[in-house]
Amino acid sequence: AGEDHGRGPYVQADLAYAYEHITHDYPEQTGTKKDKISTVSDYFRNIRTHSIHPRVSVGYDFGGWRIAADYARYRKWNDNKYSVDIKELENKNQNKRDLKTENQENGTFHAVSSLGLSAVYDFKLNDKFKPYIGARVAYGHVRHSIDSTKKTTKFLTSSYGGLNPTVYTEENTQNAHHQSNSIRRVGLGVIAGVGFDITPKLTLDTGYRYHYWGRLENTRFKTHEASLGVRYRF
């Protein structure tokens, strides 16, 4: 917009809705790493969550191409899960043996920050609407932790003589898995959206971006984001 065809530095503020997909690879209970048995359930191996976060950008508009640096912080995800299962092992002569299995899991995941650099091309359909596409490279900081405990208790319930049943604990075992990482990695993404010029200097922007943060040791993280914001050109 304008006689200079939109050239000049600009700032942009967005509010983004992000779909976050986190995949963890923990030791399996069989195979070459069976000496490092993980009690982590599938619930914490494959996390899908959502968050809303702000994003700010500073860039330069060349009249068709735009280059911008952006910064965003994401909401911390945390959850816990407790489950218990009782399995009957034996029942004869008024004596019953059961195995009680308890699982307690606590997990957190936080995309602490993302600092990106993007190159975007605007398609000028008319004086107001400008669809765009682009690519983005970003330096991301991610933290995640898991604390998982599996406890088994074998107990005997005796009803001999018709009296009130008596419960005897026979055996206890406990396995635990603890892990905490703070990782930084460079990832790649794509950008698309539409800009609407409210004034020659002010643009309403609605956009989508996909970003693959890369394999962060035993974790893979990717986000799909839809955003709405305003861009002001100086």
From Swiss-Prot:
It comes from the Bacteria. Keywords: Cell outer membrane, Membrane, Signal, Transmembrane, Transmembrane beta strand. InterPro entries: OMP/PagP_b-brl, Porin_opacity. Its main location: membrane. One of its GO terms (molecular function) is porin activity. SUPFAM superfamilies: OMPA-like. Residues 1 form the signal peptide. One of its GO terms (cellular component) is cell outer membrane. The keyword Membrane applies. It is found in: Cell outer membrane. Belongs to the opacity porin family. Implicated in a number of adherence functions. OPA proteins are implicated in pathogenesis and are subject to phase variation. This is Opacity protein opA55. It comes from Neisseria gonorrhoeae.
